[in-house]
Amino acid sequence: MLPYPFSYFSSIWGVRKPLSKRFELNWFQLLFTSIFLISLSMVPIAIQNSSQETYPLETFIDNVYEPLTDKVVQDLSEHATIVDGTLTYTGTASQAPSVVIGPSQIKELPKDLQLHFDTNELVISKESKELTRISYRAIQTESFKSKDSLTQAISKDWYQQNRVYISLFLVLGASFLFGLNFFIVSLGASFLLYITKRSRLFSFNTFKECYHFILNCLGLPTLITLILGLFGQNMTTLITVQNILFVLYLVTIFYKTHFRDPNYHK
């Protein structure tokens, strides 16, 4: 008998081993294996977050770019320049409360969403609270040519200046979703198998056997999901693929074994 964790990896291949090797791990090892499989699913997400250069700001602040109308962008394009991270504005047009360009004498923040293109940074506020300050790095004079280029530059600067916190938030959020999906699938499937115990249709006698068997069945789909994730697939696709492969693997094992040991008698 192989030592743990090699014993687990030897039980995830084929159509009979996941069933026959459902007795080898104790509860602590089963819990550790569950956490390991969730962590394995998170590897592609962590790699993708570490390699991306930008993230849409509107994901965190609703309608953040709504004040950037065509008129505002045209005004910035014609009268604003950024040199060495410093904005210079030569316009004289009246400024709406939602967008302020250049230094402002008003210190009180408005209740509505406001984008303040100050001399050294973009200040975004809402409901009389400052939400974020974004220094001008990716935001250059060329960014004012269109709304798309400006919003992309703002999102890039915001992400780069808050990268650690945003990446941590995204990884934790993805971990929660992967973990929730994992335990719903594993515990749900285990419970369904366990309640068949009285019917004596299958060889399962305890909930631990059922859960161990389900973890064995989740091993291979998780490894395949990991490989797909390394090729850039998003989280939704990975969860969907993992669930589909798990169901197909479970059905295949049932077709070959009927969830019964070779010496099983009703």
From Swiss-Prot:
Per the record, the domain of life is Bacteria
By its UniProt entry, which InterPro entries does this protein fall under? Maltodextrose_util_MalA (IPR016546)
Question: What's its job?
Answer: Has a role in maltotetraose utilization.
This one is known as: Maltodextrose utilization protein MalA
**Can you name the source organism?**
Streptococcus pneumoniae serotype 4 (strain ATCC BAA-334 / TIGR4)
What phylogenetic lineage does the species belong to?
A: Bacteria, Bacillati, Bacillota, Bacilli, Lactobacillales
